[in-house]
Amino acid sequence: MTMRIVLYGDSMTEYLHTPPRVLAGLLQDQNPEKTFELLNYGVGATRAELVLYRLRYEFWHGRQRMLPLPVLQPAALVLESCAFNNSNDQAAGLENFTRIWDEILETGRELAPHARLIFLVTIASSPQPPAEMANRLFFHAGPEIFANRHHWREIYQERFIEWARRRGVDLVNVRQAVQSAEAAGTPRTHWIAADGVHPNPAGVEKISAAIAQNISAHILKKAETT
């Protein structure tokens, strides 16, 4: 029986490719007896509110038709925090951010009661201004602009982690894994692109490996108890 996995999020998820081939390859290598269908519903500039919308309603992204949860009935949902986009609201939006995630959790359980819900926080952004050629949206902005954006991204990612722990949900914390690697001497730039935000190929591998490890561990645990 095919295991359908759907990924929701912003451009951090969209960068995992459509379909997410690195994740698909890792899952197949780790679970050769299983068949997987992976759908990447990550869309750039998505806020948590739009994840909530897409769980309930059909959505078109270019030529990609994204079906609502009652139609999909996946085995697993990977729900990325969207912290970077919601962080534009700064202090005024923090309570709304966690309220929306409460609604996402409730909606996921309601519309896909048999699905496993996996919550994802990705690699932190860089506080430094990006390379000029990669800096299209904030061309020639001062370093204080990037420091401020990074500051609020950090706060929103941390708030998401706090929320996930408080709710007792399944959390894949790539941010923490990268911080541990940084402490051991590997710079964050090893995993992020020249824009200082999105994952480069090594980052895609890092995020995909963390998701695959979580899903494969659950498959193994389920097999041992049946």
Q: Where in this protein do the model-derived segments appear?
A:
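Acidic/histidine-rich helix-loop elements
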Residues: N40-W60, G196
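Serine-esterase "nucleophile elbow" of acetyl-processing enzymes
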Residues: M1-G44, E49, L67-V71, L77
